[in-house]
Amino acid sequence: MRGIFSFILVFYTLVVSGQDNSIPLSIRVPISSRLIWHTYARGVQVYVCTQDPKDSSNFIWTFKEPRADLYADSSYHQLVGRHYFDASRNPTWETTDGSKVSATKVQQANAPDSAAIPWLLLHATGTGGTGTLTPAIFIQRIRTNGGKVPAKGGRPNKGQSIEVAYTAEYFFYSEK
């Protein structure tokens, strides 16, 4: 009986809050938000080997940009957009309907998989076009796989770029 009550309580909490409890509190959207789009990303995180600003004898891999295709399903069959940095180096998502949104990071949380890039909460800084993403205010990146920066660069790697494959799910929210 106790197990059934616990299940009902968890289910009720999910329905009422509208948010997945596996998402850390630090990257949850405000309760006043409404989900407008969910997409699956497959692409790369690009890193470049640079001199460590804290230790000039050391070289590190520095994040340069994301490049990913966005799909309607988790099998990556129907291409619906792309993800990249805009000219101002803001993460941007653009759909095949011509709408796009750029954002800045608000908060991050470690992914459950230590080899995966962090989960993020981002806030829109601008939108373009008319369509799916026009009303977007918040973006979540969750369920990441891969994409993590390599351990350490080295002098022979200075200036070189590497691409690390990743997948993620992106959720876009507007105000209710």
Predicted segments, located by residue:
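Sec-dependent signal peptide recognition
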Residues: 2-8
